């Protein structure tokens, strides 16, 4: 099996080339660099938990997969792992590249799932809770798995938009499908739902196991992280907040 040759292109002064995107393929610049240049030109971030789908052109995800595979093969070689003679690791570089780009971190490279929003024709204004939603991510420090549960509380008003139950899970999966820090991920989920639904109140609670604690480091198998985001009426009304948290805790016990 052959792998693409990765050619770094530099300008005469040693800095990264900034030629127009149309010329990059001819110059042999890696697709990751082309994408990075578009993001920088738009003055946007590309942190680990940012979505960069708007800057990836048709066909470039396949190119990116090939580039990550080639670079991952270099990592395996640096770890002194024989990928030629060992049939168990012969395809590991490609498997890992596919896992990151198409599964674990696909929330970085895919656009936001389509979500149909419905008007609140019945003028619903009572507490709604969705959960537990199983969520999976990876910490951006060690790329170790994060696995947990998410609960979402919504206090709609007559002007709020409503979404289907499955869409809460799809949006959460999209946000969590990137290298994340849990407290930031929960805020991103809350921001997304707040923008789409415009409720009077929004609450998000997440409890998760972090493999960077159980699989490495202190190797504590029992620790969990729990954090919450409260917006609007959940922040202002202590009784509503207590009701939401009590119902979530009852569901945990059940």
What is each stretch, according to the model?
Residues 2-254:
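A domain-level signal for the structural core that forms small-molecule/cofactor-binding pockets
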